[in-house]
């Protein structure tokens, strides 16, 4: 197979040099047809940054895996937003911190969720099975949503930095759910 870095460099070069919206749309469609959500997002981002109306490629809706939820799931839009931001829908990515797969699940998080929901923990499947990755992440995000009273800001910080860090920030900076604190300032 192709080296992922070379493919992304190719997309970047095309995104910056192709002259027409139609050419960029064709490249993004090709990436999508090849199942390369990350490539589609990258080309879409380059196109939008250059003023082209290709938002459907910058914000695709077809690359989130189907999964069997462990509990009442979070809104699909939240999962799409996290996947787009964290991995650009790349199911094989591992962050410098060790987060894995399409929704960037840490191994310790997977173990916690599996223990809580009494399911087998398969760390290797965080990369090898996008549905498993999504199942684990969705449960963890839904748990954070419930823990923080439905607040999107606190849910996302709890997912990204951990619930302990989020509680620490609440003590240090106050609660953005209160009207006296502007959520943008809190972030």
What positions do the PLM features span?
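Catalytic glycan-binding domains that act on GlcNAc-containing polysaccharides
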Residues: 2-187
């Amino acid at each position: 197979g192709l080296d992922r870095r070379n493919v992304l460099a190719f997309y970047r070069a095309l995104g910056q040099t192709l002259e027409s919206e139609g050419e960029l749309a064709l490249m993004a469609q090709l990436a999508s047809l090849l199942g390369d959500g990350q490539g589609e997002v990258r080309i879409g981002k380059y196109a939008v940054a250059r003023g082209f109306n290709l938002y459907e490629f910058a914000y695709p809706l077809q690359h989130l895996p189907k999964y069997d939820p462990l509990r009442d799931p979070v809104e699909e839009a939240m999962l799409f937003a996290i996947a787009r931001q964290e991995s650009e829908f790349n199911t094989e990515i591992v962050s410098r911190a060790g987060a894995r797969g399409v929704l960037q699940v840490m191994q310790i998080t997977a173990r916690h969720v599996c223990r809580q929901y009494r399911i087998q923990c398969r760390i290797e499947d965080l990369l090898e099975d996008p549905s498993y990755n999504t199942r684990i992440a969705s449960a963890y995000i839904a748990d954070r949503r419930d823990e923080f009273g439905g607040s999107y800001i606190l849910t996302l910080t709890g997912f990204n930095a951990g619930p302990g860090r989020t509680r620490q920030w609440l003590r240090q900076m106050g609660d953005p759910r209160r009207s006296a604190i502007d959520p943008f300032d809190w972030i």
